Amino acid sequence: IQRESCKKKPQNLAVFSTTHIHYLSQLNLQNTLVATVYGSRLDDSVVRERIRNNQCVNWENAEVSKEQVAVSGAQGILSLPYEGRNWKSFFPEMPVLPMFEYEEQHPLGRAEWLVAVGFFMGKSKQSIEAFKQIENKYMSHKVEQASQPKVAVLAYSGSAWTIAPSQSFWSVLLANAGGTYLGCEGDKSQEYDTEQVIELLNQADVYLEVNYREGDTHFDLNVLNPKLSAYFQTNKKTVFGCNTAMNGFFGPALLEPDVLLLELKNLLSNSNSESKYFQKLNSAN
């Protein structure tokens, strides 16, 4: 955070990712929000009420002009750096916090951005205390030494699979849960075809499919991913799904890494405990 930005604690805030609202919610700062993108996707009741009462502008999409920001009443911005817009150049006097939480490889690193938001908003003590609680809970669930089983995690778009590199968010989270992540080589995610996926699955004990299916709570692998149904009919695997459209994986989970860790830990130990973010899929086995 730029030194000059920190001197001014914004009372009215604009955000360019619905993800960032969860950091504000953790600090009870939703009432500072005067503008957001994709308001129709929000499940935060305070922010939705502000939008209904015309206290918060809903831009609905990310194509926001500097003129729209200027008339929103925002005194500070949580920006989305990969969009490529330098809001500081448009508003030199306005505090801007570029949010790079998505680049963090450690689950606690993503949660720790709460401290940056707290400092930006003048809530340093509160944010540090909140993060320490998250960190302590995470560390209490951590498995000290990674072991079997081997886990393949693939994001499925409906036409192709994407796999994260060996050093990534998933590798850290699964190692802390007692598993071994099977990632791709290099430092960037790669797209896999069906043959590459099957080759990977032959090495795995557990398959976790991450997808985005709005309104879909039916966890049948043969429906979610028909291309692999024949494979799972003849190859016994433990299969789980993570439907990010329904479970808040890119929202509340940022500040619940301890819950993610505990659920994966239970998943790898074949526990039948309830899970918020991961569901066992029904295969033909």
PLM segments and residue spans:
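Second-shell loop/turn segments in exported
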Residues: 3, 9-12, 23, 54-60, ...
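Extracytoplasmic ligand-binding site segments that recognize negatively charged/polar headgroups
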Residues: 20, 29, 36-47, 85-88, ...
